[in-house]
């Protein structure tokens, strides 16, 4: 990556930075669009088998909600799919390459999928043999490019800090006493909040797993509003992370005026009353909009009784010419006078509709701007910060959560709207997903800035998630032993959830107070021809055996594995045995936790992307009371870090067995 921190001509640096990222974004955009196009080209049945399409559907109108048309696509035969709420889908008459009809997924059932359309829905949607494909559009890439252009245009102090041309300024005063609204913050959280609020340009909060990063960030947001009297734009790269910020804010600070900007289908149902579409519909002036919509509907019905001026009937005439000829009430260019008069009536009513729509848009925009102006905090994804809705809006502070999971240009979308930046993240966990495999895009703005300006950052030190023994290895490997387990979780085990006398002897190898166990499986890594991903049958069988025991005692459990093929194999296996627990990749489970976590490493010959140690960190730190590691010891021992992991797991098990003997 170009070293933006070298001294030099600031104008050239800005231009170099913008050009570099413009090129990288375009490469990534092409990779993503090509990937989805190539996926869609695959035979429909094959694509359905891997969960990326649903075939042979029929649409049913369900109603309208928040400005969208809701349609249920169903069939008799149940389906398994990777498509989930919030996804964009391409709806087609069996051939997705010939369609440009997009919808947002609301809900996925066993044999139906509910979607929301923002456009008029064609009649064929309600007929047989409709196909739905998982899709991606390139709007976020367009917004990244627009943000880069704005970054180049503004060239303000924050831009120069990002490039290393200028240095963040120290606070004018550090002796100010803050009154914390969240009374349960620990000392490291309070310190991070105070330093962030008193900072003038930039502050970075490093939040390792379970340390209450989002909780800390929400206190920062409230302090910015209450103490600094600032208007805040709070963002995250994903809708789930944005909803987490919103949820914390409304639960802990109900007097705060918070508005969530985003498509209603991508916002949690529990939070929808704080969304912009909902607030618009409940505004006192919304009745005017409803009245205008009724008027449009009424005029459309009148209009459609007349002849639409299609090219066949226009014979090259413009609307104005048709209106002129109609007044003469004569035939023209071989068109009977009745047809000309009918077309004129259609045009007159269509013009009325357009005038009303313009009026409707003006009223909607006025209501929207009133709501946004009254808000203390606006919450959105990074991408939605660049939408038309927030065009022209400026903020005192930009707060970005999960900053270590977003590509640098994604963070620029909200950043160009503010004067001060506060970011929270953990660069020791997974980087953003980059299809082009470009290392320069994988290195995040959060990581760059925290390495450049360590004095403008702090780490949250107390973790509230896991047993201290589970924490031990990641703490040493990734966090320089700075983490401490809170007393509330320090010694938690499965035996807090299950009475020891109720455990059958055959289950005690797993259902015990040992927080970490490594189980060696001499399996074989396999790969199917049509998939680049790996699976391991022997490991899957061992996972099943262990999960059966955990489920028997109703212990909340998840299985994590780095490979999609192993995820699919395990899901089928669990379905055959009527086991209903979630299996996911490391990427799919980041930001979450459970009482017991089982990890299947899969590989037996080569490491593949097991080599990305951030994946290992994420996988391990999802567990609260029990972590079970399943892998091929002969392979894993060849890597220094994995060898340390095995030694650690065995030492924890040995230590607890000795304690049991001593009892």
UniProtKB/Swiss-Prot annotation:
Recorded source organism is Methanocaldococcus jannaschii (strain ATCC 43067 / DSM 2661 / JAL-1 / JCM 10045 / NBRC 100440) (Methanococcus jannaschii)
Q: What is its EC number?
A: 3.6.4.-
EC class of this enzyme? hydrolase
PANTHER family the UniProt entry points to: DNA-BINDING PROTEIN SMUBP-2, DNA2/NAM7 HELICASE FAMILY MEMBER
For this UniProt record, give its keywords in alphabetical order, as a comma-separated list. ATP-binding, Helicase, Hydrolase, Nucleotide-binding
| Nucleotide-binding found in the keyword field | yes
Read off the Gene3D superfamilies from this record.
Answer: 2.40.30.270, P-loop containing nucleotide triphosphate hydrolases
Q: Any idea which GO molecular function terms this record carries?
A: 5'-3' DNA helicase activity; ATP binding; DNA binding; hydrolase activity
**Xref: NCBIfam families:** IGHMBP2 family helicase
Instruction: Name the family the entry cites.
Output: Belongs to the DNA2/NAM7 helicase family.
Protein name (database record) = Uncharacterized ATP-dependent helicase MJ0104
Give the SMART domains listed for this entry: DEXDc
Does the record carry ATP-binding as a key word? yes
Q: Where does ATP bind?
A: 207-214
Q: Which Pfam families match?
A: AAA_11, AAA_12
Q: Which CDD domains has this protein been placed in? A: SF1_C_Upf1
